[in-house]
A protein has these predicted regions:
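Short edge beta-strand segments in beta-sheet-rich domains
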Residues: 32-34, 129-133, 300, 318
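Conserved beta-strand scaffold positions in the cores of enzyme catalytic domains, especially
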Residues: 36, 133-135, 248, 274, ...
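A generic structural motif
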Residues: 37-39, 137, 320
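Active-site core segments that coordinate phosphate-bearing ligands/cofactors
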Residues: 2-5, 11-12, 21-27, 86, ...
Length: 516
């Protein structure tokens, strides 16, 4: 029998909080290989829980940088052992957990450019980092630095207009400021600061990869309109910061070819391109194939909204990032803490712990709930900062309780109305071609999705997003190969599996979520 034809492909990587994952996607956009290395399970010597170390103060949260390097060694060796044909890889790209930062020690670039193919990366890069434990997105120890940054630029709203977000503890600029203030010696011995995404890209390049616009938008340092570092923000954080960061680049940039290390050790082709790595949320937007006017709603423990925006209006809530697949446009992220746990609580209290009873309540109550409205925040909400359960009757009077079925509809309509109101606050508008892509646990409940369609007045589709950051990275690698010819991302991914239609708005629904 003839050998199966070799499959040209792109690789998509995801350096996330708990694991490193890879997928291989062929020219027809089929995923035909995937693998992962789990930090807690496969790298016990680093002693992480959930991929991180939570320090004694409960606020500082870090990950060992060499753990990430060793994870890449392990996964590449696993691929080699499985017989994966690296010679067919046209390009690769990847995603990193957002906001985390890596500090390369003076002299590290020479080591990167002269790697020996006979040794794993982690053995050669041991002395290359001025900070061995990298701050990650779960860290909330930089409140003082956040206040300093906002004061330096004229307040929280001014910072948001400039960089897309007010100052957040996890954002990289504030983390860099803390390191400069508390460990000035380590800072002075740092020649380059990478995000987790550009750090991972640097490992493949054998030289420092630039930060891309989209992940760079999560630092409180990048001017999202001009796509350059804000001098005021850099100056407020630390000296000589611009030279340590390098210049940012468009997210679809080809930043180089893989280092000869990968050619000699694993058999990558010398021409294999590295497309700029980005953050995990922007990569997920690519994996879900959002287009202009679309929204993705992830209905999980917390609910997250991804929006495609043309003209953003940055606010004190939510985040605006440069769009990873269209340099002219933007994306927004809104996070809501009271997600599935709140839905489960009301299900337990009002529907005898049964999702089918919960669905019956949504089916038997009318759209708009007879004017009854509720907002349910059992834990302190992020968007907006508010706590408690708030119920309003049709006469707009606060009431202490609703009938069980009204309670259930009030919860779901209220959750989705809040999402629409906050999305519109960031400049989002529902368009005739708008699609809503629903993912996460609650996306399996068609009655919940019907309410979502009615509140936004747009059709809801469901999509499998098990590996959306990884698959999105492979799609972006294909786009990087084509982007030099100005081919739009939507054209590159048109062969990918289509999402499934789950709900269309009920006639008259446009009145429900429309701003009053």
């Amino acid at each position: 029998m003839a050998e199966p034809a070799a499959r040209s492909c792109c690789l998509g990587w995801d350096f996330s909080t708990q694991q490193v994952k890879v997928v291989a996607v062929d020219a027809e956009l089929n995923v035909f290989y995937e693998d992962s290395v789990h930090f807690d399970r496969d790298l016990l010597e680093f002693g992480t829980q959930g991929g991180v170390h939570v320090h004694e103060n409960g606020l500082t949260v870090t990950s060992p940088v060499l753990m990430w390097v060793k994870a890449l060694d392990i996964i590449l060796e696993k691929m080699k052992t499985s017989g994966f044909d690296f010679s067919q890889v046209l390009a690769l790209s990847g995603a990193g957990q957002q906001h985390g930062s890596v500090y390369w020690k003076t002299g590290a670039s020479q080591v990167l450019t002269s790697l020996s193919p006979n040794l794993p990366l982690h053995e050669q890069l041991q002395a290359c980092f001025s900070i061995s434990d990298c701050p990650v997105w779960m860290d909330s120890s930089t409140t003082a630095q956040c206040r300093q940054l906002e004061a330096a630029v004229g307040g929280a709203q001014a910072l948001s207009c400039l960089t897309g977000s007010r100052a957040y503890e996890r954002f990289t600029g504030n983390q860099i400021a803390k390191i400069y203030q508390q460990n000035p010696e380590a800072y002075s011995h740092t020649e380059r600061i990478s995000l987790v995404s550009s750090f991972a890209a640097s490992l493949f390049l054998g030289s420092y990869s630039p930060i891309d616009y989209s992940d760079g938008s999560g630092m409180n340092l990048l001017q999202i309109q001009g796509k350059v570092w804000s001098q005021a923000c850099l100056g407020a954080c630390a000296p000589h910061l611009e030279e340590k960061l390098g210049s940012p680049v468009p997210s679809c940039s080809v930043v180089g070819a893989v280092s000869s290390y990968y050619v000699q050790r694993y058999g990558f082709p010398p021409g294999c391109k590295v497309v700029a790595f980005t953050g995990d949320n922007p990569a997920s937007l690519a994996g879900m194939r959002l287009e202009e006017g679309d929204i993705a709603v992830s209905l999980g423990t917390s609910d997250t909204l991804f929006l495609w925006l043309q003209e953003p209006t940055p606010a004190l809530e939510g985040h605006i990032f440069c769009n990873p697949v269209d340099t002219q446009h933007y994306m927004a992220l809104l996070c809501f803490k009271n997600g599935s746990l709140m839905r489960e609580k009301i299900r337990d209290e009002s529907a005898s712990r049964s999702w089918s009873e919960f669905s019956k309540a949504l089916q038997s109550t009318e759209m708009g709930n007879g004017g009854n409205l509720g907002f349910y925040f059992d834990v302190m909400e992020i968007t907006p900062e508010i706590v408690g359960r708030h119920r309003f009757s049709a006469e707009n009077r606060e009431v202490s309780a609703f009938p069980w079925d009204v309670e259930i509809r009030a919860l779901i309509e209220g959750q989705f109305m809040a999402k629409r109101i906050h999305a519109e606050g960031l400049g989002y508008r529902v368009m005739p071609k708008t699609k809503i892509l629903a993912t996460g646990g609650a996306s399996h409940n068609r009655d919940i999705l019907q309410v979502l369609a009615d509140v936004f007045g747009a059709p809801v589709y469901v999509i499998d997003t098990a590996n959306s950051a990884c698959v999105g990275s492979a799609y972006r690698a294909f786009h990087g190969l084509a982007a030099e010819t100005d081919v739009p991302f939507s054209e590159v991914v048109k062969l990918a599996p289509n999402p499934r239609l789950a709900a269309t708005p009920t006639p008259g629904a446009s009145q429900l979520g429309a701003p009053s």
